[in-house]
A protein has these predicted regions:
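Detector for Asparagine
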Residues: 2, 54, 71-74, 99, ...
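Short, low-complexity N-terminal intrinsically disordered segments enriched in polar/charged residues
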Residues: 2-50, 54
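Poly-acidic low-complexity segments
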Residues: 6, 37, 86, 134-135
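Short solvent-exposed beta->alpha transition segments
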Residues: 43, 47-50, 57-106, 112-117
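Preference for short coil/turn "hinge" residues that link or interrupt alpha-helices
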Residues: 50, 56-57, 125, 130
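Exposed beta-sheet edge and beta->alpha loop/turn motif
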Residues: 97-142
């Protein structure tokens, strides 16, 4: 093979490879960026759900907003105040959404309770002084 033909083929393959990588990045970049932006809030939400499941109500109490703490009264009353009336056996995180100014995140969980009933729990978090806190909890029963 001629040296010029080899250079043209290698250059063509390199251009195709670069275009392929750019296409993959263009397709998946929005999801990757969103995952990076929501990760700290999702960690707080996951910790809250784990605390509720494991009965660490004091831990869960520290992750909610001042308004929720004030209305619930104390850590022991938190699940009832939020509408989580049965023990959680398992939960799986579903979707998460972040608002345009990146100060509010909503995280969905699919939950199985001790009596095998299922529900969705939506946690709304707000960024307060660089810390994420839970400002609202919605329990949607199936």
């Amino acid at each position: 093979m001629n040296k010029t033909v080899k250079i043209v083929l290698i250059t063509g393959l390199a251009i195709i490879a670069i275009c392929g990588v750019l296409a993959i990045v263009a397709l998946f970049r929005p999801g990757i960026i969103r995952d990076i932006q929501t990760k700290p809030a999702c960690k707080v939400a996951d910790a809250f759900m784990s605390d509720i499941q494991n009965g660490d109500l004091g831990g869960a109490y520290t992750l909610v907003s001042d308004d929720i703490r004030q209305n619930a009264g104390n850590a022991g009353a938190l699940p009832v105040y939020l509408g989580i009336l049965k023990p959680i056996v398992s939960f799986d995180r579903g979707f998460s959404m972040i608002n345009d100014d990146r100060s509010e995140v909503t995280v969905a969980y699919f939950v199985v309770f001790g009596d095998q009933t299922e529900a969705a729990i939506l946690l709304s978090l707000i960024k307060n002084d660089e810390e994420w806190e839970i400002m609202d909890v919605s329990v949607i029963k199936n």
